[in-house]
Amino acid sequence: MGVMGWSQGGRLALLTAARNEVFTSVLTWAGAYDQKGNEAEQYAIAKENGYYEVTYDWREPLKQSPAYYECAMSIDYPAEVAKIKVPLLAINGKADTTVVPETAQKIVDAAVNSPDAEVLLLDGADHTFCVFSGDDTVLKTLVQDTIDWFKKTL
């Protein structure tokens, strides 16, 4: 059985694969990872205001509570990803400004016990893989790459 997730869901997919041996493959779409550099400053604002507001150009603002940051900052993501012992694919858009493309390589670099850890960067893809652009070319590529990965690893 495979596990996958997008953005924060990608972060959860990594943690799930690290902590549950039932999964035989893991895949992330713009998977969030260890963002402690940003999170400390945002946490301070959340503590002061009751939340930190994250803005996007594709959805309404997201208000993150201090508890979100406390949880996120308490996890050693590299150590967790190092527990993954199954194939891992980190897909990211080259034009993603929410979870920058370099994040995918950080995930793969931490996956030291995975027998097959790969990065796939998609040209022209933003954080939503261009689903709001009216052109589904990137999305079709993403879906096919996902299908191909799970066919190969499940």
Predicted feature descriptions by range:
Residues 63-80:
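Active-site nucleophile elbow and catalytic-triad environment of alpha/beta-hydrolase enzymes
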Residues 111-128:
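Catalytic histidine neighborhood in serine/cysteine hydrolases
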Residues 84, 90-92, 96:
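Short beta-strand/loop motif that positions the catalytic acidic residue
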Residues 1-5:
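Alpha/beta-hydrolase fold nucleophile elbow
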Residues 86, 100-110:
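Short alpha-helix in the alpha/beta-hydrolase fold that links the catalytic acid
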Residues 125-139:
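Catalytic histidine-centered segment of alpha/beta-hydrolase-like enzymes
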Residues 15-64:
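Hydrolase active-site cap/lid region
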